[in-house]
Amino acid sequence: MFSKQDQIQGYDDALLSAMNAEEQRQEDHIELIASENYTSKRVMQAQGSGLTNKYAEGYPGKRYYGGCEHVDKVEQLAIERARQLFGADYANVQPHSGSQANAAVYLALLQAGDTVLGMSLAHGGHLTHGAKVSFSGKLYNAVQYGIDTATGLIDYDEVERIAVECQPKMIIAGFSAYSKTLDFPRFRAIADKVGAYLFVDMAHVAGLVAAGLYPNPLPYADVVTTTTHKTLRGPRGGLILARANEELEKKFNSAVFPGGQGGPLMHVIAAKAVCFKEAMEPGFKAYQQQVIDNAQAMAQVFIDRGFDVVSGGTDNHLFLVSLIRQGLTGKDADAALGRAHITVNKNSVPNDPQSPFVTSGLRIGTPAVTTRGFKVTQCVELAGWICDILDNLGDADVEADVASQVAALCADFPVYR
C-alpha cells in the first residue's frame, strides 16, 4: 500500500539530485532553443495526477476498459477546448508526440510507397516530412522542396513544378526552422492542381495561430497536426485537427488507436486540457506578440553585427543564424554559448558544408525567455552578448563576463516566482 506522504526525497536521492540539478539549470541558464518552453504549475499538477493510473483504450463513450466515466470527461474537455481554440471541427488529443501525430496522418491517408512532398530537413523541414532517416523517408517515396538560397524564402513556383512532376499523394507544409510565414492558400492551390492531400504541421507556430498572430491553416488543410508544448506552453504531446469530414475523422482515429498507439496517457491529456484553457486567456495573445517582438529584435541585432540571418529576418518565434561567412561551426558556437549559460542548438543552414552533427548555424527562439518575462530590452542585450561570444569564440574571459551578466539577468527574471 502506498502512502499519500511518499516522497522521492529520502527514497531515491540519486534521482532527486539529478532532477533538482535540472530545475536549477533551467533557472540559471537562458533558454533559446526554439522548441522549448516553460509550462505552468497547473499543467504540471495535471500531468502529475492520479490520472496516470488509468488505462482507457478507445475514445470517450467507446472504451475497451471499464471505469472510464471520469477520464471520458477529461478527454472530452480537451477535445472541445482544442476545437474551440483553433476553430476545428475535429480534434484527436491522444497522440503522445508531434511525430506520432504525423505518423498517424501518414497511416490514415497513404499506402506504403506513396509519394509525399515535404520540406527538406536541410532547408528547415522536420524529420517526419520525408527525411531519409525517418519512417517518413523509409516507408514512403519522399520528394523534397527547399528554399531559394538567394532569398531564403520558399519558391512556390518551384514547389508547384516539383508537385506536377512527381504527382505526390500528399503535400506537407510545415517546418522546424523556417522564419517566414507559410502561404497556405498557395499550398492548397498546388495540392488541388495535382489532386493531393494538404497536410500542415504547425507544431512550431501553434501558439501564434491560437493567438491570431499567424495564419490559421485549418481552412486550407485536409489535416493539421501540432505539438502541445513549444509556443503552446503545454505538456509534451501531440494533437490532430481537421475540418468536418466523417470519413477522414474515422481514418485519423483508427490510425492513432489502434493503428499506432495503445492506451492514451490520460494525465497528459488532462494537462493538454489545462494548456488549451490557458491559451484562451486574454494575456496569451499579448505573450505571443511579445514572443514575435523579441525574436525580431534579436534577429536585427545579429544583422547589425554582420551575421547572416537566413531569410533576412523572422515573422515568428525563431530565426537561423548562418556562421558560414565567419568560418565558424554551429557545434563550436553552441558549446561556447553553453559555457556562458546560454542554451541554443546548432542547426544546419542552406548550402551547409558541415555535417548535421557539426553544422554551420544556430537556431534561436524566444518562447521560453518571453515566458520568463524578457522584453525587447533584455533580448537586445542578450543578442549582443551572443554576438560578443561569436566574435571572440573560445575566449574564456568573454565567456566568463557574459556568464556573470546572464546570472544577474536570470536572478531578475526567475522562471517560477
Curated annotation (Swiss-Prot):
The protein, known as: Serine hydroxymethyltransferase 2
- Read off the InterPro entries from this record: PyrdxlP-dep_Trfase, PyrdxlP-dep_Trfase_major, PyrdxlP-dep_Trfase_small, Ser_HO-MeTrfase, Ser_HO-MeTrfase-like, Ser_HO-MeTrfase_PLP_BS, SHMT-like_dom
Region forming the signal peptide: none
What family is this? Belongs to the SHMT family.
Molecular function per GO: glycine hydroxymethyltransferase activity; pyridoxal phosphate binding
Q: What is its EC number?
A: 2.1.2.1
Q: What class of enzyme is it?
A: transferase
- Tell me, how does this one assemble? Homodimer.
Function field:
Catalyzes the reversible interconversion of serine and glycine with tetrahydrofolate (THF) serving as the one-carbon carrier. This reaction serves as the major source of one-carbon groups required for the biosynthesis of purines, thymidylate, methionine, and other important biomolecules. Also exhibits THF-independent aldolase activity toward beta-hydroxyamino acids, producing glycine and aldehydes, via a retro-aldol mechanism.
Q: Which cofactor does it need?
A: pyridoxal 5'-phosphate
The question of whether Methyltransferase is a record keyword is answered with no
At which residues is N6-(pyridoxal phosphate)lysine found?
K230
**Which positions does UniProt annotate for (6S)-5,6,7,8-tetrahydrofolate binding?**
L121, G125, H126, L127, S355, P356, F357
Q: Which domain of life is it from?
A: Bacteria
